Amino acid sequence: MGQYYKTRLFNEETKEVLVFNRRVDDEYTWGKLREHSWWFNPFVNAICEKIYEKPHRVAWVGDYADECEFYEEVWNVDGIGVKSTDFLLDGKVLVNHDRKIYLDCDKYFKMNRVYDKGKLTVWCLHPLPLLTAIGNGRGSGDYRGTDENLVGDWYNDLISVEMQPPLDYKDCTDYHFK
């Protein structure tokens, strides 16, 4: 069996917790980590838009990750869906405020994109679900590949998408998820 994931956002200012079930415009989207952690995935893009200039604690919680402190909070509710969006990470940075680091999205995309042979299609694994996942490696469909040991490295950290990195933060774009 494969492990399925839901996304949890926690706003420290308002204390609001949101649990997302990966539905986009009331349509089911694939739930395994490797199935939906793609650059142009509409669900992941909608989550990025929700944290645009609004830091949240972010966690992609697997249904096998029962050691997670809010496992029941995530898996005992249906969760909410998102609306499709045109939001993209072009020209933006993914910021981890707890660690005072950022990932330059344009650089990351250029380093990690892969072209389908004989096609113009570009594939790139999205760093946000991978960096914030808990439970990876326990089911089929989980990420196994380059920098696998870094999956979950930003789990439940305070993260936002910004146009510019904060001045005193360090560039950590050297992630290779392929």
Residue ranges and their predicted role:
Residues 21-24, 31-35:
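Catalytic toxin/effector domains delivered as secreted proteins or via bacterial secretion systems
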Residues 32-178:
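Low-complexity intrinsically disordered segments
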